[in-house]
A protein has these predicted regions:
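Bacterial N-terminal signal peptides
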Residues: 1-7
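Amphipathic, charged alpha-helical segments and their helix-to-coil junctions
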Residues: 11-175
């Protein structure tokens, strides 16, 4: 009994509730951590650059389309058709290129989240052990629980200490 109470007191001192079940918000865990905030800033910046690039391409293609429309009145159909087809191919190529860049950006975000959750596993295991809990459940999947079981804030604080914004870890993984 004394050992159990000592473990309970130790868990309480560490800011971890003593319970068999803990809850956590994985969305907040990522979004509110230094790692997640850095990734989200980078993705947003790359998305903004991509949107600006797309606007430039659309403006360029609009000018070309206007020129092509003006040429249509002056050229015989057999001369105009290859120009129109080449323009259509160019438009489709730009669309495909931009779509591929958006897909790559989404993949990068997913890969960063996957890496994050792999990196934080030891932190969550420590929380689990310190609390004496047997399971950590996604908070959004729980119908009703006490806020005492939510260790999201505690986990974020520990994650920030252990991996920070993760930039050095990601750089090492990319080398």
């Amino acid at each position: 009994m004394t050992i159990f109470l000592a473990g309970f007191a130790q868990a309480q001192q560490l800011g971890v509730p003593q319970t068999a079940v803990l809850t956590i918000s994985s969305e907040r865990l990522f979004a509110d951590s230094e790692f997640g905030q850095r990734v989200l800033r980078e993705i947003e910046a790359e998305g903004t650059l991509l949107a600006e690039e797309n606007e430039r391409i659309v403006a360029e293609l609009s000018r070309e389309e206007k020129d092509l429309t003006e040429q249509r009145a002056e050229l015989p159909p057999e001369d105009f058709r290859p120009l129109a087809e080449a323009f259509d191919e160019k438009v489709q190529s730009h669309r495909d290129g931009q779509r591929a860049k958006l897909d790559a950006l989404a993949r990068r975000s997913e890969e960063a989240q996957q890496m994050f959750f792999e990196l934080i596993q030891p932190v969550l295991i420590d929380l689990l052990r310190e609390s004496g809990a047997t399971v950590i459940i996604e908070r959004s999947s729980v119908f009703l629980s006490s806020d005492r079981t939510d260790v999201t804030e505690s986990a974020i604080a520990r994650i920030n200490v252990v991996i920070g914004d993760g930039s050095t870890i990601e750089n090492q993984a990319n080398e």
